[in-house]
Amino acid sequence: MNKTNRKWISQIVACSFLAMLPIGAYAQNNKTIHGVVKDANGETIIGASVGQKGTKNATVTNLDGEFSISVPDNAVLEISYIGYNNQRVAVGGKSSLEIVLTEDVHKLNEIVVVGYGVMKKKDLTGAVGSLAAKDIENSPVANIGQAIQGKIAGLQVVDAGKPGDNVTIKVRGMGSINNCDPLVVIDGVPTDLGINAINMADVERLDVLKDASATAIYGSRGANGVIMITTKKGKEGKGRLSLSANLAVQNATRTPDLLNASQYAALSNDMMNNSGNTANPEWADPSALGKGTNWVDELFRAGYMQNYTLSYSGGSDKAHYYVSGGMLDQTGIVRSVKYRRFTFQQNSDAQVQPWLKMTSNITISADRKQQGSYDMGNTYRALPVFAVKDASGEWTGPEGNSLWYGSVRNPIGPTTTDRSSTKGYNLLGNISAEVTLAKWLKLKSTFGIDAKFWYNDSYTPKHNWKPSPVEESSRYKSDNKSFTYLWDNYFIFDHTFAKKHHVGLMAGTSAQWNNFDYLNAQKNVFAYDGVHEMDNGEKMHAIGGNETEWALMSYMARLNYEYADRYLLTATVRRDGSSRFGRNNRWGTFPSVSLAWRASEEEWFPKNNILNDLKIRAGYGVTGSQASVGNYSYLASYNTSVYPFGKTGTEQSALISATLANPNIHWEQVAQTNIGFDAALFNQRARLTFDYYIKNTTDMLVKASIPITSGFEDTSTTYTNAGKVRNTGFEVSLNTVNIQGPLQWETGIVYTYNRNKIKSLNSDVPYYINQVNNSYVTMLANNLPINVFYGYVTDGIFQNELEVKEHAIQTGAEPGDIRFKDLTPDGVINDNDRTVIGNPNPTHIFSMSNTLAWKGLELSVYLQGVAGNKIFNANKIDLTGMSAAYNQLTDVLSRWHGEGTSTTMPRAVYGDPNQNNRISDRFVENGAYLRLKSISLSYNVPQQWLRALTLNSARITFSCENVATITGYSGFDPEVGVNGIDLSSYPISRTFNIGLNLNF
């Protein structure tokens, strides 16, 4: 049916409807009002009800969102549409109206995406957090991971900072000492595709399944939570062309204050004098050196980002379509760092027969990360006494006495000479057929593919760097291919019995298979830097490759039962069979059950303006994780090598046993209990969700003890399912409408509390992990949180010889050195005095958003932060160590130089005889912060200004991301990795953005 015919039919229907209305509504003084109804994005709304208040005089909008109605001059029109706030408009002397309806975000009938289906939010019995496109559309960030930070309770998101890198996401704490990343499902296809490959403008909504009753449908992959991403679909109506354009400039939120040349020379003289070495005679007068080179300023720059998306969507009552293309181009705030991404999205569905609906979703992305060989740590450590280049234009570097000049190469040169890039090409798609077998029964079959290709390429030219030259040029290349195929088949039963018993049932199968193939090689010695194809390399350095496969076969079912809209039951079971495990442990069953009671639907429930709706939920279930299990972990593995045989010792090819067979390895399991409630208060103006959970991980993979008689000395060669971890906590989400009317003010508050503890490692012997300068920083031990910091406890500074003498034996100690506590106490400072010195896991995660709207203007302010965690500032080991030829932070200007001069910063002494810089609480700091994450100001251009341009809507946005941070942390930024160690991290950027959204 073409557009003209649809208009005629809608007009005939409208006229017929009007003809049946009471004649009294059309008095002699009536006039005809023409108008159009749109949403906040300028899209017309089809089927909206437009009526005269207090009468039965009403009409509906046609396929173009237009209406006409005859009313008196003093009439008030009431406009309503499902999912939007009702609106009243006085006619007055107007003859035409443009009405914009705002979405009612508090509607209980909001649809939530769950595994293999959707549910109304009011019918949920589990813990699910959701975000719609409007919640993230004004965020001036490069990927959706950055945009969701702090906005969903129970979700910890840590930004990597570097363009193109993925954020780190944890759901309800760290459930394992191994991989505990959530499963990502995009348009129904489980994938390990990084979410930074998705164009944020294509995302319709994001749902996070948190408790077992929600995640058990994904069985052995649901233990760490599930992130459901749904891309945009076409809507019924004429085609809509949309353009989104964003331009941004970025800079570092904070940079370190380092010594200038004269300050460093004075420090070097102190280090030499205090260690009995000869000071550099050229630095006898440090002030003569001036400021020298600020290497941080040389490495950092202003970054730029541009992000464009063009989309076209529409549909009829039989079919819908959405097509978009996007381009993101970003230059990092560090020299030579660049990132570019192209995306294509195509979604369509068609009711090809009354009994058959076809759907397809295709996501394609291509990206490239590019950089030279930058080194944040060496940039901080490089001495300011050297220029970037010498008088002849050559890169400078230290030469001569290493005690004075050190061994840190010029950190800027390699960013220009070296080349490194990663190219990625991703295809994620599915096609499904939904067959209606009966009004209450459907069969859905989906075929999906997840194809990824990525190529690494790096080239390092031969160069006479000082003090250590690169003797041979080298090139490294790797080609990686991954194909994952999915085939889902399941029945959907949905029926209501006796008007009160509603039953929904999903049952079916899922099969997934993956093939991964990689090849890498490195060749050295290229005659010309400009011609470095692999064939031109003279020396083969290394070559390698491998091919692996895995498969997963599953049976799953979910039952939803509802009685009288009051009592709700959800029961789920999934049985998975994985090729990663031996025959006796290949299959696992993962059940869950949850109940909900909508108390507000009971007849006795008080009807008032305070508590309008109350639903109480409880659930329990078991899910699994195989993320940390290799494809062939249950088998013994061998490496190829050579071995001398016979009397002559002739080398022959041989196989060497690498790991023991482990046929008993199986899934890690998580049993989770969840109790919560959802409430609506104050005439639906406040929405409160609360959840309390206990999350117990069992059968966690830990190192197995192996008898030395086996021939294996390294206990990491095999693992056993014997570990236990517990996470407990609660989550609160509160959304309020504070002011309604011409001025609107809404607030959102999200809070998460989580405690983490290792219950068992199958041994009382701790594991020490994460090294800095060849010393372990973190520890795994029974009855402690995951990754606690482990080291010495400081006790001020020795001020004189008497204090040194009266203290426990501390080798190398002299006045001005750090004093360490003797915790044993055995009178000697040694490894036995190390203890837990901090917990990197945040106990509190919180955020608050405020949005004010008035006459087309919208101001949004978003705060986000964490508390209860510590950070190990590993940068300070070298940058306040004052024991080697490294530049230092200006903190060392307050160093100890005599009794009473300092109680926190030790003396400068080359070689560090007291080990002042050993792992200790000296480097542990409070990691709490409150960040003004974003401010955005948007303006919706009035419709009368747009008519001449044939625009439906236009929106201009000015925004800033990472505006300011309140923190006691002295490092560059308190947002560090989940292990809590801050070491040469890529800095977080502050972004200033201007955006334009046009809808035609």
PLM feature segments, named:
Residues 1-345, 350-353, 357-361, 365, ...:
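Short, small/polar-rich motifs associated with maturation and membrane association
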Residues 121-122, 217-219, 237-238, 252-254, ...:
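Switch/connector loops and helix/strand junctions flanking conserved nucleotide-binding motifs
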Residues 136, 174, 181, 275, ...:
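Extracellular/periplasmic, surface-exposed regions of secreted and cell-surface proteins
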Residues 242-290, 720, 739-840, 880:
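Conserved small-residue
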Residues 274-291, 305-309, 376-412, 419:
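Acidic, glycine-rich flexible loop segments
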Residues 284, 296, 467, 539, ...:
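Extracytoplasmic gating/loop element in the C-terminal half of outer-membrane beta-barrel translocons
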Residues 839-872:
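Glycine-rich, aromatic-lined ligand/substrate-binding cores of catalytic
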